[in-house]
Amino acid sequence: MKDKYILTAESVTAGHPDKLCDTIADNVLDACLKEDPNARVACEVLATAGKILVAGELRTTASPDVEAIVRQTVRNAGYDCNYHVEVRLHTQSPDIAGAVDGDTLGAGDQGIMYGYACWETVELLPAPVVLANRITSLLTTCREEKLISGIGPDGKAQVSVQYAFGVPERVDTIVISCQHDADKDPDELREELCRLVIARACHDVRIDEQTKILINPSGRFVLGGFEADTGLTGRKLMVDTYGGLVPHGGGALSGKDGTKVDRSGAYMARYVAKNIVAAGLADVCTVSLAYAIGQAEPVAVEIDTQESGYYDDAFLTEAVRRVFDFTPTGMIRALDLDKPFFAEVCNNCHFMHPQAAWEQTDKTEKLRMTCAELEDERT
């Protein structure tokens, strides 16, 4: 390990065009699940100046008013909704339905998912991820609660943290791009963001005189949202997960029901990793899962603790396979993935919402007991 190094992560606000598309897709999913807990949903959203397109596949008894959902979601994000909304949702392929449905649910597709946890923060996430997402969450709060006047819904943040011997030591650089009114004084905006956002977000990692704080480094940021940038679901994968600091299998999360292992597998992998670290079985843990379409059990479950584990990785892998059910049915049941709450967790990282089932550390004692039983079996 290098003595000193810098790790960086970014986040975006709920009003960012890509994130707003994710929120629309998850609101469509939630609307289906409210009426039909067994709904099969794969919803994608493309939005640009003047037009929002909702497309994908459904198999459900629900009849959501998709256009109304789109318009309300855009308004809730802080924009006017003067858009033509086009809906192109069709029935799920019978081939996929046949592969997934059965006595035991099969995976909705093949794929690789990763989950991660580490000791660095209370959230058991890397410090740059936590700080970047706190900033974007506070940007939205400051706008909605009118703590800062003259700012818009669109925004981004990026945080670089300097580490010393594996420990977060100080904040090296903070970048914030915040949409604002044309007459907003830039010096006033900087002072408000430093006082009401940065100071509150970064209270537990040191900011010093050498910390670089860049506010709207491109200059003006008046035009935002879909009028400035085209938005698309699934284009903020690193923001949704671990900020690019952990491997990613490439599958997006939003707009997908629990049979889609891109989503359920990513949540379960995080759940397992967090419980391993919370149980004191490792300082750092990456969980990788792999699935084949139509098959219930994963084709691979692997644990990597970067040699920080109390037990070796093969031992921990065997333990988690005894404790956790990695089938789609098991993951949906354990993580409440047939409940309509997905729009609540799709902003500011899917793993920074303490109310989510996959963020609970309720398997720590079971993991410790299972490891002890495995030890006894081997002696």
Feature-to-residue mapping (PLM):
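N-terminal, positively charged regions that mediate nucleic acid binding
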Residues: 1-40, 47, 367-374
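Glycine-rich, mobile lid/loop segments that gate access to catalytic sites or pores
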Residues: 8, 50, 68, 72-75, ...
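Alpha-helical support elements that line or immediately flank enzyme active sites
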Residues: 10, 14-33, 121-137, 257-280
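Conserved phosphate/anionic-ligand binding catalytic regions in large, soluble enzymes, centered on
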Residues: 12, 16-21, 105-121, 222-246, ...
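A short glycine-rich, hydrophobically flanked beta-strand micro-motif that places a catalytic Asp/Glu
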Residues: 41-43, 155-161, 211-215, 281-292
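Short, charge-patterned binding micro-sites
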Residues: 42-60, 293-297
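Internal helix-turn-beta structural module
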Residues: 48, 284, 291-379
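Glycine-rich anion/phosphate-binding loop at the beta-strand->alpha-helix junction
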Residues: 184-277
